[in-house]
Amino acid sequence: MKLAIVIINWNGIKLLKKFLMPLITHNNNENEIYVIDNNSSDDSIDYIKTNFPKIKIIENPKNYGYAKGYNEGIKKINADILCLLNNDVQVTKNWITPIMDEFKVNSTTAAIQPK
């Protein structure tokens, strides 16, 4: 099963600087990471391109907001599982394991979220 980690962003360079490195550190290299950018006017996109060239960037032509921003961006992602994260989420070691385990064990699972 292919999992894509997807982050929505709008002018979030300060948060990206704080939370992207732990995300990459605690990601196995099988999962692609995407940032859907809602037409940021800060240096978010340049920061990602310069410091994290493996992260895929999807640029929305305008700020669609949270839900529509995700909806527009995920149309361009090919994965079995979409893990939607805010840009201020700090992940920990093995955080992906229970997500993948649930989808592998229960074929009827459509969505999960933490407590």
Region spans (language model):
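Short, acidic, metal-binding catalytic loop of nucleotide-sugar glycosyltransferases
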Residues: M21-E30
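A conserved acidic beta->alpha catalytic loop
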Residues: P22, D37-I45, K62
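Short beta-strand/loop segment that forms part of the nucleotide-sugar
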Residues: E30-N39, I58-N60
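Glycine-rich, basic loop-to-helix element that forms the pyrophosphate-binding segment
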Residues: E59-I77
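Conserved donor NDP-sugar-binding/catalytic core segment of glycosyltransferases
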Residues: T92-K115
